[in-house]
């Protein structure tokens, strides 16, 4: 009698490795807080926190090439076609993209940094521009290196991407620990380089490795045009999404005190760990959804999505309750040198916000896997305007809670209903 082994779905294997990777990454970010505050002090750590917000902005430096390439790979796999030429074309284009953005950052760093870090002019003095430019360079290496991970996820070996990503953050943390225990004096710039540069360098090394393997592959003009045509839509969506999701950093840099900035960023990093778990599932599901869409298996796709949204929302609620009940113990370990005073109202708003994110991010992923971005181009700019105004207005009276309320309002009035409605219309058309 044969014993049939239980076959674990590939997306769950990838998601499982992603969970572990995200836990390690978030663990590194949380563990680093205590050391960084000790080395930099609360005010300089507030500056460090604002600069790390640039990491999300710099995720756009690939011009959407990585996401467009990921979908091409998934489609070629579903049709049993080679996709090597697409990868090589994408890597050529990404090199041009990073050169362009480096020049852009160099030109505009002075103007942007003067406004973004205006509350800390006395602390930074004449170092603002160079600190901002250096941060952009470091985070751009991470943004362009993410193409490597998108290739691996599309090839359904995302566990390799998760392993490399986790390893890179661990190397950064080891560097920070070395500096701390050796008693080496550091500033904000060196702290950023030590902690984050390994993250970009490891992924860039993998890109070089893949390019060497594809050196003999022939590319044509049609490959470049195809990548550019599709990536342009993803780039615009990414840029608009960043404006929406990073408006809070722009607001808190102008509206909140250094102490509140630290409390806000620390709290969001903790909840970022919670949400990382769900985004890991979405990341693993993306190529699966793309293949199901090509095969027109809508019933299976809809069931998968419904289950994920339900479980994701319950998970967020449970984690919010747990973090609130044990907040004193949690924050005494993570940031023992700060006076933590985030209200129950803020915790409730954070829970609501991330439940909304579960819903919206799922449908955004579905539409992107279908290469349908038009509705996002319409709704996301509107969301950015609503979010910016609401956060600016409510933060003046409610502080941290006002920023969170503004975020919730921006989602509720736009993408919360617009994305699922658009998906249903597209799915019914087949």
UniProtKB/Swiss-Prot annotation:
Cellular location(s): Cell inner membrane
A Gene Ontology term for the protein's cellular component: plasma membrane
GO BP field: O antigen biosynthetic process
Domain of life: Bacteria
Pathway per the UniProt entry: Bacterial outer membrane biogenesis; LPS O-antigen biosynthesis
Transmembrane segments: 23-39, 45-61, 96-112, 131-147, 163-179, 192-208, 236-252, 266-282, 309-325, 342-358, 373-389, 400-416
UniProt-listed InterPro entries: Poly_Biosynth_Transport (IPR050833)
Topology class, membrane: Multi-pass membrane protein
Keywords, alphabetical: Cell inner membrane, Cell membrane, Lipopolysaccharide biosynthesis, Membrane, Transmembrane, Transmembrane helix, Transport
General function of this protein: May be involved in the translocation process of the nascent O-polysaccharide molecules and/or its ligation to lipid A core units.
Identification of the protein by name: Putative O-antigen transporter
Organism of origin: Salmonella typhimurium (strain LT2 / SGSC1412 / ATCC 700720)
């Amino acid at each position: 009698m044969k014993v049939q082994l239980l076959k674990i779905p590939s997306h769950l294997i990838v998601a499982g490795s992603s969970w572990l990777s995200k836990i390690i990454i978030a663990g590194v970010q949380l563990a680093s807080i205590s050391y960084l505050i000790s080395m930099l002090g609360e005010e300089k750590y507030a500056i460090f926190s604002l600069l790390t917000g640039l990491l999300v902005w710099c995720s756009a430096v690939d011009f959407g090439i990585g996401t467009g390439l990921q979908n091409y790979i998934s489609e070629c796999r579903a049709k049993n076609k080679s996709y090597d030429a697409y990868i090589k074309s994408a890597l050529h284009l990404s090199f041009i993209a990073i050169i362009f953005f480096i020049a852009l950052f160099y030109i505009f760093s002075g103007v942007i940094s003067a406004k973004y870090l205006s509350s800390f002019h006395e602390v930074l003095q004449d170092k603002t521009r160079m600190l901002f430019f250096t941060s952009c360079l470091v985070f751009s290496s991470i943004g362009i290196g993410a193409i490597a991970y998108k290739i691996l996820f599309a090839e359904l070996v995302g566990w390799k991407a998760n392993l490399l990503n986790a390893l890179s953050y661990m190397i950064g943390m080891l560097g920070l620990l070395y500096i701390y225990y050796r008693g080496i004096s550091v500033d904000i710039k060196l702290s950023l380089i030590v902690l984050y540069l390994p993250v970009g360098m490891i992924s860039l090394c993998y890109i070089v490795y893949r390019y060497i393997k594809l050196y003999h592959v022939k590319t044509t003009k049609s490959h470049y045009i195809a990548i550019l045509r599709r990536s342009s839509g993803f780039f615009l969506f990414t840029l608009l999404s960043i404006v929406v999701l990073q408006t809070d950093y722009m607001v808190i840099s102008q509206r909140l005190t250094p102490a509140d900035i630290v409390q806000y960023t620390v709290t969001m990093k903790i909840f970022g760990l919670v949400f990382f778990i769900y985004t890991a599932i979405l990341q693993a599901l993306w190529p699966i959804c793309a293949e199901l869409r090509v095969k027109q298996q809508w019933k299976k796709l809809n069931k998968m999505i419904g289950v994920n949204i339900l479980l994701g929302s319950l998970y967020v609620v449970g984690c919010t309750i747990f973090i609130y009940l044990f907040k004193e113990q949690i924050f005494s370990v993570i940031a023992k040198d700060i006076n933590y005073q985030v209200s129950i109202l803020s915790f409730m708003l954070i829970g609501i916000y991330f439940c909304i994110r579960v819903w919206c991010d799922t449908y955004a992923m579905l539409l992107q896997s279908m290469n349908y971005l038009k509705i996002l181009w319409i709704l996301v700019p509107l969301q950015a305007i609503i979010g910016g105004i609401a956060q600016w207005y409510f933060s003046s009276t409610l502080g941290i809670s006002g920023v969170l309320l503004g975020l919730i309002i921006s989602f509720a009035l736009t993408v919360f209903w617009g994305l699922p409605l658009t998906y249903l219309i597209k799915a019914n058309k087949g």
